[in-house]
């Protein structure tokens, strides 16, 4: 299958994989060998967000980075509503179709609810968790509610996202602390997946869902105690907006009792852009803690997991 848009190969030098999903296609990256790490993005990002993490770790473990339907290079099936519930179903389908075993879930932004929905329903298949600037409960703090009402509201929020591509054009650069990293290539990579107003709707549904998906988020929250004994690395960008204050990080520390935490004073919301090196280190660490140590050339051996790849 052909890419729907071009991306700088020096930035994103990966082979494309495609998983049929209903009458759509899920695009994903599948790099490396060894213990399986699933990298989940948020809004309005895609697997490109993890490019520098994948480059650093591809010789040490197997990294799977999907694009949700309607994001990145994935094609949404007919009737797809772009809700987090549907994205969670798509991620579950991908994990099951690829037969991924004993996975590490790496989650940030909406990747938290999407990925942890899988984790709370399949805790025995989750080896570890790396968690960055996210939540998995109904929004109660005022900044998040106001953000949802503005960015996911009608008509202003809808106009901003569908007519101005506001999330990709403005919020992503604003959520990166190191401004020298906000290059023309990066801007292009995040705006190109949304060339028309109709294709930008997914970026509006996500902020709208902060309020609209309350019951679904509450169901995840009720099951979070199932994750208490899973080793976790919490990586928190302290320069993030008021929606992800330190108090939210501390809440995660109380839930994920087997956590190790690193608070980053030089990272904002998109930790993967600001500090991909620390994301990679956190993945290595959780693998070490779970006896699935990342492969180091000529020093560490591992037992390959039972899984398969699909290419079209």
Question: What would you call each of these model-derived segments?
Answer:
Residues 162-226:
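Conserved alpha/beta-hydrolase catalytic His-Asp/Glu region
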Residues 21-31:
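A short loop-to-beta-strand scaffold at the N-terminal edge of the catalytic core in hydrolase folds
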Residues 257-312:
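Catalytic active-site module of serine/aspartate enzymes centered on a nucleophile-bearing elbow/loop
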Residues 231-267:
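Conserved loop-alpha-helix segment in the C-terminal half of the alpha/beta-hydrolase fold
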Residues 22, 65-107, 281:
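Active-site loop/oxyanion-hole signature of alpha/beta-hydrolase fold enzymes
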Residues 29-73:
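Conserved HGGG/HGGXW glycine-rich cap/lid loop of the alpha/beta-hydrolase fold
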Residues 101-141:
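Conserved hydrolase catalytic core segment
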Residues 40-42, 108, 236:
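The conserved beta1-alpha1 loop
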């Amino acid at each position: 299958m052909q890419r729907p848009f071009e991306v700088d190969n020096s930035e994103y030098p990966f082979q494309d994989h495609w998983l049929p999903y209903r009458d759509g296609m899920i695009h994903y990256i599948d790099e490396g060998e060894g213990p399986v790490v699933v990298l989940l993005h948020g809004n309005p990002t895609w697997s490109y967000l993890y490019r520098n993490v994948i480059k650093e770790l591809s010789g040490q473990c197997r990294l799977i980075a999907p694009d949700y339907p309607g994001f990145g290079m994935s094609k949404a099936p007919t009737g797809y509503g772009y809700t987090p519930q549907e994205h969670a179903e798509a991620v579950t389908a991908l994990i099951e179709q690829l037969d991924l075993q004993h996975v590490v879930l790496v989650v940030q932004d909406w990747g938290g609810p999407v990925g942890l929905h899988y984790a709370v329903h399949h805790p025995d298949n989750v080896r570890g968790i790396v968690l960055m600037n996210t939540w998995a409960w109904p929004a109660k703090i005022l900044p998040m509610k106001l953000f949802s009402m503005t960015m996911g509201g009608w008509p202003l929020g809808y106009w901003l996202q569908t007519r101005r591509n506001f999330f990709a054009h403005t919020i992503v650069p604003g959520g990166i602390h190191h401004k020298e990293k906000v290059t023309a290539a990066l801007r292009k990579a995040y705006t190109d997946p949304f060339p028309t107003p109709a294709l930008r709707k997914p970026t509006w549904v996500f902020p709208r869902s902060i309020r609209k998906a309350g019951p679904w988020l509450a169901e995840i929250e009720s099951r979070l105690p199932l994750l208490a004994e899973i080793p976790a690395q919490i990586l928190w960008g302290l320069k993030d907006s008021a929606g992800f204050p330190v108090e939210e990080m501390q809440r995660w520390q109380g839930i994920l009792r087997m956590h190790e935490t690193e608070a980053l004073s030089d990272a904002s919301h998109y930790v993967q852009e600001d500090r991909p090196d620390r994301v990679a280190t956190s993945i290595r660490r959780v693998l070490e803690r779970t006896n699935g140590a990342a492969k180091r050339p000529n020093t560490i051996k591992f037992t390959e997991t039972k899984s398969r790849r699909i290419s079209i």
